[in-house]
Amino acid sequence: MNEKFTLTGGARIGTANASYPLADLYVDKEVLKINASIVGNLIFQPKDIISIEEYNSIPIIGNGIKINHRIEKYNPKVIFWTFKNPATVINEIKKTGFLENTNSEISTEDLKILERQNQGGFPIKKPVVVIFVVLWNLLFLSDIIPFFLQDKPEGFPIGIGMNIAIGLAFLSSILLLISEKFRSLILKEGREFDDIKKFAYLLVFVSGMMFVQFTIMNL
C-alpha cells in the first residue's frame, strides 16, 4: 500500500476548466484533494465518493478520471485531466487505501473538512470577485465607450482605463505573493496561498507583460 499519491494535470469542475499543469491531485488514506486554483479546490473523504471512473473524450489530451460524489456544495461534474492512462491513475488511488477506508469515527480533522466543503470549491470570497469584476469593467468601458463615440475611430481603444485595470490585476497578484494580510482579505476563511498559488504566478506573468505593453502603447 502506498501512503500517498500525487499527480499534476488539469481539471474540469462544472463548465470551468484548468489546463495542464494548473491542477494537482493528492490522495492518501484519509482524503482526496483536487487543487485547480481559482477553478476550484475540492476535498473529499472516502464516504463522499460514489465512484471514480475513467473519462475519455479526446485521445491523449482528453483523458482523465471522473469523480462521482455526494457533496451538495460542489459541482457534480468533477474531472481530473491526465496524460497518464486513467486506469493506472485509478489503480494508484486504490493503492493508497482511500477507497477502502470505511472508518466512521469523526475527528477534529473531519470537522475541518466538512467546514471547507460547506464553503464550496471556489477559494476566493464572492464579494471580492464582484468588486473586482465591476471595477475592471468600468475601467475598460471608460476607454471603449469614448472610442466608439468618435466620428471616425482610429487605432485601438486602449487608454489609461485599460492600463489601470491591468495594473490593478498585476498589483493584486504581487500582493497575493507577498502579503498575508492581503490574502486574508481575498481568500475564504481556512483557505491558503497554496490553493491559488499557480493562478497567482500565472497572473503575475500575464498581467505584467500586458501592463508593460499597454504602457508603451499609451506613451
Residue ranges and their predicted role:
Residues 27, 31, 39, 50, ...:
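Extended aliphatic helical segments
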Residues 7-43:
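Conserved beta-hairpin
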Residues 1-14, 51-130:
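Acidic, Ser/Thr- and proline-rich intrinsically disordered linker/docking segments
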